[in-house]
Amino acid sequence: YGCEDAFLAPGVQKLAWQMLEEIEPHTRGLVVAVGLPVRFESGLYDAAALVVDGRLAGLVCKQHLAGEGIHYEPRWFRAWPRGRRATLALGGRSIPIGDLRFDCGGVRIGFEICEDAWVADRPGAALAARGVDILLNPSASHFAFAKDEVRRRFVLEGSDRKSTRLNS
């Protein structure tokens, strides 16, 4: 949230890509998720990049934007359509983008980004039906007292519904 209108600046988007490219070679033997704004076709998307063993595996874009109260994500980003998958051509690379599921050595990983987890028809339900083993939820929001406990309870309840387990 700290970038606010700077999300729209091409320089910020370019710097985010440069930082991702700088991180990539340091992920050998690791699976790493990195958040960044992604320009695709005519829109800007709030995305999570999954980097696996030094290589960008793909980008998952947020499907539900927070737009009430102090949240105004629609000012900067577009919501990604559920089920849509595409390819982003960037710097000579073809990068999978969209509503993706990743297979990392037999472990299936999916994402729902922040607000995606707070809606009734959350992407996690569809990802569970697609057989994900691990559901990642990168989140950032304003400060509130005891918010960490609210998030923990929320994740535990969602895990129970999906027959998954949370270890903390």
Model-derived features with residue positions:
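Enzyme catalytic cores with a strong preference for nitrogen-chemistry domains
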Residues: 1-168
